Amino acid sequence: FWDIGFCTGSVSVEAKLQFPHLRITAFEKRPEGVGILSDNCRKFGTPGITAVTGDFMEVELHEYPTPDAVFIGGHGGRLVDILRKIDACLPPGCPIVFNSVSAASREMFKEGIRTIGRNVKETVCMTVDAHSPIEIIKAE
């Protein structure tokens, strides 16, 4: 499992809680994210998450286990480039999941998915209040 743009590591930690056997590689541009992830791993008892810091576009992905699924939480405005990069090393049918908080990022993801020849399979909208809808989009 790859968590791209992990921020606080909440998705990685939850994935590890749900599936303790899962090999998780979490990528984050900001160095301070590693400390936050480490604290959250200790707090929730989820050791074994590999944190990788730096610009994702410069990471040598072949150095990490091929994922069964990918979650993109942060993209720094380079979502389509990230999709192209991961598509080159993902197995066929590997799910790519993205959380979108804006119409612009939702459309950017959908366009990127089309660009790499994959299809959106499912969209779930979560709304806490009228001002904070989040769409979770799954593509394969």
Where does each model-flagged region fall?
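Conserved SAM-binding loop of SAM-dependent methyltransferases across substrates and taxa
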Residues: 8-21
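A short glycine-rich, Lys/Arg-flanked "PGG" loop and its adjoining helix->strand segment in the class I
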Residues: 81-95
